[in-house]
Amino acid sequence: MIFLTRTVRVVVLALLAIPITAVFATPHAAADARKRSQAEAGALARKMLAQLKVSRPLSIRGYSRRHFQPRWEKYKGRCNTREVVLARDGRRVRKNAACHPVKGVWYSPYDGKKLKSERLVDVDHVVPLAYAWRSGASRWSPARRRAFANDLKRPELVTVSHSANIAKGAKGPQSWRPPRRAHWCRYAVSWITVKRHYRLFVTRNEKVALLNMLRKC
């Protein structure tokens, strides 16, 4: 398994944290910090992308979501991974006794929608499970596939609108990109970070699409 260097990890985490930290800065300072962080993350993502193996996609034969995720795994107490992500990504989230969110506000970075009902959001796998299967995950152990599907350390899980998640499906960046172009940099950085960590290969068209998205950094 390839682990991110400390520098790469810090820059990626800094990019992901921009919306939170920016509220404490002036508009101009926040914009400057965002541009610097995106530029650094984009440069490192290009280096990581250059290290990924380029290959043709494997067959989808044998794929089933159950090979990755029979169900969301329990994380802490009664909370499963999905519930942890919804609590992490939402604002003013209220949960019932079973840890299920019953109220909150979620922002979908893919399309810019502000959603006030848990029924309108999904937890998306940035690198879709079926896509990962064709990128090398078909050769993994069941335990490794479950770890991938429930990974809270890498930028693999994100709360998005149900409509955006359905539109994306199991497509790669060569076939689908977030409608909100301002998210292209972060999306590409997240995709590459996940693929590098799990040593998943990329296709030629996928690599070209990612490089185009990184121009937004």
Predicted feature residues:
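N-terminal module-boundary/linker segments of secreted carbohydrate-active enzymes
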Residues: 28-75, 206-207
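Mature exported/compartmentalized surface modules and terminal targeting/interaction regions
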Residues: 3-8, 29-37, 190, 194, ...
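Secretory targeting and sorting signals
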Residues: 1-31
